[in-house]
Regions:
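Structural/interface elements that position substrates and couple domains in central-metabolism enzymes
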Residues: 1-437
Length: 437
């Protein structure tokens, strides 16, 4: 089977590499010539565990190719996945210009049946706009060529995307015809031979499912952060509370960890987009507005804890950040809590030293020389008055407290992810602060 994936960013590249791995012939398309040339050389523009090896393996096998020209591959593919970006407009709504550009290109050059599948996260009603854009181009050409549109939202977790795609807990597909359903079944069956967990539904429901899923997860995070902040005020321990409620099978244990807020390319954007979709349809998403407000407040919580610990002001202090990416196992700093924290520290007159196993280049791109970049976690702590854990990378979980005691000037440790044992850190001679206790 031959397919094209338009958009060779995070979603498109993972999708293309994983389909190629099960024997599908895949052409990944992107308008960025430099990106495509690097991909042809096996250079991956993002960090995702296992992705580089998967891309290179399938390139070598001849199942994965890259091009800047969608029109050049249309005649040899039957299914086109659109995985282009949908950046938020100023009002929070999703910008569909790239999605519709892909649709128009398909309509302009297609010569036989195509199934056009939207993989990007898009608002309800986008598939119909895609259908209309393709049909407009066909009408302008005076051609009557059959085609289908479908919705197949991704549910990949950065840092675990390959496993998520190869062994999904479910695949959501919105279709309008039996032919589209048959093609999507054929594509996904190899991933789900032992348990075919493809959930077919109408297209609007599939489009809504993606937004609803991410918004639900964001809600759990903000709820637990709210509970954590209350725990601090009443003398409770949020970790004990988490264990108590997580044991309830109706609730479960996932996404119940308190911290310094969520970030990334999905949750913030999708919550905003769903709020905007509701407004456009005369409805107010009261809960999601609160979720968003709690998260923005939580991104500043480490700064406020530090400001409280140093009652005589932060100016002139040196502060170390362990972790820059919005979560471990990625270099993604989009909407990361670290960015809010760094901005506030710099505004307060602090010197900021940073280290992250993967996001240093991304931080340099965003912040330039505003912060000091260290080569490792202990160099980052050199002469620091305080150390703040922002991203819970594995290498940060068992630090040598004795080394830190010799390296740091001060004794303040603020744990933004509740990784460390309170007694252990305090017995090592540090002033320890965390979230929710």
């Amino acid at each position: 089977m031959n397919i094209a994936i338009v958009g060779s960013g995070y979603v498109g590249l993972v999708t293309g590499a994983c389909f190629a791995e099960i024997g599908v012939n895949v052409t990944c398309v992107d308008v960025d010539w430099n990106k495509i040339e690097k991909l042809k050389q096996g250079e991956i523009p993002i960090y995702e565990p296992g992705l580089k090896e998967l891309v290179q393996k399938n390139q070598k096998a001849g199942r994965l190719d890259f091009t800047t020209s969608l029109e050049s591959v249309l005649d040899k593919v039957q299914v086109i996945f659109s995985a282009v970006g949908t950046p938020p407009d100023e009002d929070g709504s999703a910008d569909l210009k790239y999605v519709l550009q892909v649709a128009r290109t398909i309509g302009r050059y297609m010569t036989d049946y195509k199934l056009v599948v939207t993989k990007s996260t898009v608002p309800v009603g986008t598939a119909q706009k895609v259908r209309h854009a393709i049909q407009e181009e066909l009408d302008e050409r005076g051609l009557d060529i059959a085609f289908d549109v479908a919705s197949n939202p991704e549910f990949l977790k950065e840092g675990n995307a390959i496993s998520d795609f190869m062994s999904p807990d479910r695949v959501v597909v919105g279709v309008e015809s039996e032919k589209a359903k048959e093609l999507m079944t054929k594509l996904y069956k190899p991933f789900l031979i032992n348990n075919f967990r493809v959930i077919f539904m109408d297209i609007p429901s599939a489009e809504m499912t993606k937004y609803a899923a991410n918004s639900m997860l964001a809600t759990r995070i903000s709820f637990m952060n709210d509970i954590a902040n209350l725990c601090e005020r009443v003398g409770a321990d949020v970790n004990m509370v988490r264990n108590g409620i997580g044991a309830d099978t109706r609730i479960g244990r996932k996404f119940l960890y308190a911290g310094c807020g969520y970030g990334g390319s999905c949750f913030p954007k999708d919550v905003k987009a769903l709020i905007k979709t509701a407004e456009q349809n005369g409805y107010e998403m009261t809960v999601l507005k609160a979720v968003e407000a709690v998260n923005e407040r939580q991104k500043s919580i480490l700064f406020h804890k530090l400001d409280t610990a140093w009652q005589h002001g932060l100016a002139g202090k040196t502060v170390t950040l362990w972790g820059l990416a919005f979560k471990p196992e990625t270099d993604d700093m989009r909407e990361a809590p670290s960015l809010v924290l760094i901005r506030k520290l710099l505004e307060a007159g602090c010197t900021v030293r940073v280290y992250d196993p993967e996001a240093m280049d991304e931080c340099r791109r965003r912040l330039g020389d505003a912060v000091i970049y260290a080569r490792d976690m202990y160099e980052a702590a050199l002469d620091a008055d305080a150390l703040l854990l922002v991203t819970e990378w594995k290498e940060f979980r068992l630090p040598a407290w004795g080394v830190l005691k010799k390296t740091m000037s001060g004794r303040i440790i603020i744990d933004g992810r509740n990784v460390y044992d309170t007694d252990e850190v305090r017995e090592a001679g540090f002033e320890y602060h965390c979230i929710g206790k």
